Amino acid sequence: MTTGKIYFATTNLKKLNEVKEFLKTDIDHMRISMTEIQGPSEKIVEHKLDQAAPFINPKDAVIVDDTSFSLEALGGFPGVYVKDFLEIGTRKIWEIVEKIGNKSATAVCSLGIAHYENGEIVKKVFSGKLKGSITEPEKDCKTEFGYIFIPDGFNGVLKNMPTDEKNRISHRGIASRSLAAYMASKGIIKTHGP
């Protein structure tokens, strides 16, 4: 496949830079207004792809993402509503979880891609999951759960891990490697990341 541009439709430039690092290729920022439905992460990603795909040309591809963070103590809440839930702050989240007693948590990243194949748009979704537990935060944060999330088998929070180690084990790293392998197999990128 002769490739055109690869776009990432997101409002979060940090996510854009992380995906660029994983895919080791140029990715342009697609600035479009998207509505976000309620539901499972994969359905949200599929809906985002439906909104972004009409903006690409036949040689282009577009990537979208969704992240969920589920607390076992809260029956899987906040899940895909993590961005809104974080507005109460990581300190308050810790206090709630500590009262209930179950500190288990799961982070999931779902990455979707839309591209043309034989004149038709093809859409695929790849997910990565990271299990861990919640700990008391060193500081209160209202934008990232990495300050309170310790991946299983590690001693420190995800946010403080060395970048190489975090990328190797993180939910976004797992999803990105699957996406990269797919993109390489379709000739969308020549090589893929770690």
Curated annotation (Swiss-Prot):
Gene3D superfamilies: 3.90.950.10. Its main location: cytoplasm. One of its GO terms (cellular component) is cytoplasm. One of its GO terms (molecular function) is XTP diphosphatase activity. Belongs to the HAM1 NTPase family. It comes from Encephalitozoon intestinalis (strain ATCC 50506) (Microsporidian parasite). The keyword Lyase does not apply. GO terms for biological process: nucleoside triphosphate catabolic process; nucleotide metabolic process. This is Inosine triphosphate pyrophosphatase.
